[in-house]
């Protein structure tokens, strides 16, 4: 019997996650989405996307469902997750993508409503485990872990190549900066926001702000706790971001040796997660790339040619790459129910 999934929150990540599941894990049955937006608007936004173009399939709707490739997916409009009919719908896994229920105590409402597992598509608080595929999924224990976080898009970019660096050369200290596309948390025009910098127009400014990616790195690679910090620079592009990581290594090395380590991992244990690009590309060339992290090999540097201080830059589609991991992690959890 197919594993049944509900999606709570049908915004940017919720919609892309459904598309990724249809593409990457068609054996999983998405039976419902819950969102305050009405059915016709949900169908329209799923079918037509200003960033990625039109959905490669059919999308229609009824009074209470969107119909994707002939399969009806019920649309709910329930604000209290404890009242969601997950039990009646036989939902096994809920993808929590509203951004409102990232605390485990709040996300657990889906369990109370009848689901078996909750996958939070964001950094979480009090979760049973944070998983970055390719890095620490081996620690997952279905008997113990009910509330699972998929971390952030930036942590999913940083952690795989940080793992390679740490395993191969040792990380002593590092500072990361993500040059990150704007998100729905920002404003089109200047308006009040709890972060005074994010209060400014997303389309007109480069906006320094915070990121939890560096600290979250320690959740999946514990030996890096306290060794890495960083920030975010939001820029006026719709998707595709890049992590710029300056790092002091334990061992002396060269840029070529670092890139060779990345290539070996990308062809082996991190295949499909980590990539290496040798071409002189720009951000839009990575739009729609399903990998979590794509090293720009020409930008890898080691001061003096041989040394311990290095810089690595890695691209990621912060929407599609991340949503692909949501789909993959959903499949991973489903296979272990």
Which stretches of residues belong to each language-model region?
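N-terminal Rossmann-like NAD(P) cofactor-binding subdomain of oxidoreductases
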Residues: 1-199, 304-305, 328, 336-337
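Generic structural signal for well-ordered, non-membrane alpha-helical segments
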Residues: 14, 103, 151-154, 158, ...
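Predominant activation on well-ordered alpha-helical scaffold segments within soluble catalytic domains
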Residues: 18, 108, 159-166, 177, ...
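Glycine-rich beta-alpha junction loops
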Residues: 36-38, 124-125, 152-154, 178-185, ...
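Short, solvent-exposed beta-strand edge segments and adjacent coil->beta transition regions
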Residues: 144-145, 201-203, 240-244, 309-311
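Catalytic core of tubulin tyrosine ligase-like
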Residues: 170-232, 247
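Short, flexible, solvent-exposed loop/turn segments with mixed acidic/basic and small polar residues
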Residues: 194-196, 233-238, 299-303
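C-terminal active-site/capping subdomain that shapes the small-molecule cofactor and substrate pocket
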Residues: 230, 242-337
